[in-house]
């Protein structure tokens, strides 16, 4: 629920920590990272949003397979199914995450915040309501200094 963009850098096992990574807006993994929801092998269900976030990120069929089997997957598979945004070599993971954070930080922060809000709220409703949310937030941007500067610099 943070208003700021949160980026996860995963460099190793994300099993119990998979829920934490899934709660982030963007997930960058090193090639040695592994992901899973192994709770069923321990006789419990995934907690802390694991069943809900995984389903939203990878789809119901893949989430069921991963949760019901307790399977651990490698970073490249996690990228393929949409669990992580990208995979990089372990020695440049932090550098790549910092680069991405700097790119995001250079943008108008209110617009980034409103974009995140539109995505989050829109995902919880039908498309028409989502478009209404987006439209309202879009309109709020027009009264900002950032928007006026952005339009001038775009020319």
Curated annotation (Swiss-Prot):
GO MF terms listed in the record are: lyase activity
Coiled coil location:
none
Question: What EC designation does it have?
Answer: 4.2.1.150
Keywords, ordered alphabetically: Fatty acid metabolism, Lipid metabolism, Lyase
Can you tell me which family this protein belongs to? Belongs to the enoyl-CoA hydratase/isomerase family.
User: Pathway it acts in?
Assistant: Lipid metabolism; butanoate metabolism
- Source organism's superkingdom? Bacteria
Instruction: Look at the named UniProt entry and state the broad enzyme category this protein falls under.
Output: lyase
Query: Could you tell me the Gene Ontology terms of the biological process aspect for this record?
Result: butyrate metabolic process; fatty acid beta-oxidation
Instruction: Give the gene symbol.
Output: crt
Which reaction is the catalytic activity of this chain?
a short-chain (3S)-3-hydroxyacyl-CoA = a short-chain (2E)-enoyl-CoA + H2O
Protein's name according to its UniProt entry? Short-chain-enoyl-CoA hydratase
